[in-house]
């Protein structure tokens, strides 16, 4: 009796090659497509670039992949659950002036919880996804492709959820995955990577968010001088470190968002990428998920996806909180994830609650 593996088939090349590799290894492979977003049900009218529902296009591609591989494809809808567990969190955080990462919560509540339960109903011994990550024993390791490593997004997935999980492409680079897809004539071999919000797709961000949150105009303040230099159109449209599309088209100097105050609806900017107002040296991290029993004092941290690792000193607090100290971290942003590594191993991850400089709360980050 072959071991049955249910693969999350998204309609993209990574999940397609994952299914291919598992089939080559002799597993009984079954595809399962999740539809987690419905533009009609969710009143999603603004921001769709081509007028075509991307979720149905993805399902078409998923079906073509499974037909090519001669494996069955099932479909499940988690539209309500995604809205309640992931998207409402996303909107709530935006309203607080923070910068959330919905992909992290999607993994926690949908891909490695509801999906796994649905796979078990299909008789799965294991599940697999197209994440660039590796599991060795009970350790979560970075994917071999440093540019594509997705352990950052897996940082809120529990050790229990990671049991019976396979990451078939974690040992490959993206070019190697593309090469395999072309070699075996997979219909999505040349499909471009998705870069939008998890399961929603690529959108004009501000237009998309305007479906659900109405931005309130407010002042843009030069943090150095305290002078008003412009007007913003809703704090949810900006993130710390942002340079483009701030709304100061007549200003020839390079300006960066360095702070947001949701109480006064104020956006703060600083000039120059090396501005001291973009720097911090300490952060309080909440809702920490411990993926390992290792609790080192010295490690490295990633404060946003694809950012460079930063050496940190860690203090372990009560209530699943940690305090991390570092040297001149740039654009460390409340609401984003802080993920801790020891070499290749992902140890833990939590949400940045508060940021400090020289032992003081940063006043323009409220």
Residue ranges and their predicted role:
Residues 1-155, 182, 257, 364:
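ATP-dependent adenylation/nucleotidyltransferase module used to activate substrates
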Residues 128-134, 140-366:
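AMP-forming adenylation/ATP pyrophosphatase catalytic core
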């Amino acid at each position: 009796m072959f071991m049955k593996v249910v693969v999350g088939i998204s309609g993209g090349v990574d999940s397609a090659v994952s299914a291919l590799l598992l089939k080559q290894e002799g597993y009984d492979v079954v595809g399962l497509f999740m539809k987690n977003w419905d533009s009609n049900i969710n009143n999603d009218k603004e921001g769709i670039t081509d007028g075509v529902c991307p979720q149905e296009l993805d399902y078409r591609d998923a079906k073509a992949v499974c037909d090519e591989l001669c494996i069955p494809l099932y479909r499940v809808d988690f539209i309500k659950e995604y809205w309640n567990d992931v998207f409402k969190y996303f909107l709530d955080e935006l309203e607080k002036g923070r910068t959330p990462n919905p992909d992290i919560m999607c993994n926690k509540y949908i891909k490695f919880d509801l999906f796994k339960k649905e796979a078990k109903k299909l008789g799965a011994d294991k599940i697999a996804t197209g994440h660039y990550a590796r599991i060795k024993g009970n350790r979560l390791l970075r994917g071999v492709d440093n540019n594509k490593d997705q352990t950052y997004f897996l940082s809120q997935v529990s050790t229990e959820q990671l049991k019976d999980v396979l990451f078939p492409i974690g040992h490959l680079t993206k070019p190697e995955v593309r090469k395999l897809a072309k070699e075996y004539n997979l219909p999505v071999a040349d499909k471009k990577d998705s870069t939008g919000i998890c399961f929603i797709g690529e959108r004009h961000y501000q237009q998309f968010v305007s479906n659900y949150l109405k931005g309130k105009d407010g002042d843009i303040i030069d943090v150095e001088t305290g002078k008003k230099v412009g007007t913003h159109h809703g704090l949810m449209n900006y993130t710390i470190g942002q340079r483009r599309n701030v709304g100061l088209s007549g200003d020839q100097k390079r300006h960066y968002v360095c702070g947001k105050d949701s109480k006064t609806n104020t956006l703060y900017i600083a000039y120059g990428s090396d501005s001291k107002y973009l720097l911090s040296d300490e952060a309080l991290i909440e809702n920490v998920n411990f993926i390992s029993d290792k609790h080192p004092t010295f490690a490295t941290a990633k404060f946003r996806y694809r950012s460079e690792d930063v050496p940190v000193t860690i203090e372990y607090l009560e209530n699943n909180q940690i305090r991390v100290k570092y040297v001149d971290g740039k654009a460390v942003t409340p609401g984003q994830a802080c993920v801790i590594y020891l070499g290749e191993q992902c140890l833990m991850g939590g949400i940045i609650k508060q940021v400090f400089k020289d032992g003081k709360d940063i006043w323009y980050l409220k």
